[in-house]
Amino acid sequence: MRIILLGAPGAGKGTQAQFIKENYGIPQISTGDMLRAAVSAGTELGLKAKALMDNGQLVTDELVIALVKERIKQDDCRNGFLLDGFPRTIPQADAMKEAGINVDFVLEFAVPDEIIVERIVGRRVHAPSGRVYHIKFNPPKVENRDDVTGEELTTRKDDQEETVRKRLIEYHSQTAPLVSYYQNEAKAGNAQYHKIDGTQKVSEINAELKNILG
């Protein structure tokens, strides 16, 4: 079972990735984690990636594909894998296909931009403990104070509205075209494509995923 999750930042992919991992016993492959692991292990690919990053350059698609190929040969991927944060662009999706990395399911989590902004901008964190609140959906007992310590809550830089809207613009220009790409792949019989309403309750999305994945 090889799965790709699509959806804007804040669409709930992380929560559902956790659910899929726990229920289907397949690893989540994050390209960011994979790059960091390769760099710290000093592998040939890791050294190439480090050289690019040290020069302030982006890691090439070829290098990421090579890392993905290497990663999915590992034992824990024999029943499948869940790709997180990759592919992000059509050239990456094409390169993946050319490298013989096939997928069974592409799951798109659709959430309107305004709801995503509300979800992310309303987050408040207690940095020392990692506890996360939301001013509307999961408020602290005392406004802007951590429930346990009473310390002040903060907003992460990534959760500020301007940053969120920039990330959404980037998503719509780069990653959203993958929706039609994978819909065409599904029509050609190369994968199953499912669009999921990401505004539903977590339990409802879980039930829908069980229905799709079996």
Curated annotation (Swiss-Prot):
Residues 122-159 are annotated as: LID. Pathway: Purine metabolism; AMP biosynthesis via salvage pathway; AMP from ADP: step 1/1. GO terms for cellular component: cytoplasm. It is an enzyme of class 2 (transferase). Residues 30-59 are annotated as: NMP. PROSITE patterns: ADENYLATE_KINASE. Its EC number is 2.7.4.3. The keyword Zinc does not apply. One of its GO terms (biological process) is AMP salvage. Pfam families: ADK, ADK_lid. It is found in: Cytoplasm. The keyword Transferase applies. One of its GO terms (molecular function) is ATP binding. It comes from the Bacteria. Keywords: ATP-binding, Cytoplasm, Kinase, Nucleotide biosynthesis, Nucleotide-binding, Transferase. Catalyzes the reversible transfer of the terminal phosphate group between ATP and AMP. Plays an important role in cellular energy homeostasis and in adenine nucleotide metabolism. Monomer. Consists of three domains, a large central CORE domain and two small peripheral domains, NMPbind and LID, which undergo movements during catalysis. The LID domain closes over the site of phosphoryl transfer upon ATP binding. Assembling and dissambling the active center during each catalytic cycle provides an effective means to prevent ATP hydrolysis. Belongs to the adenylate kinase family. This is Adenylate kinase.
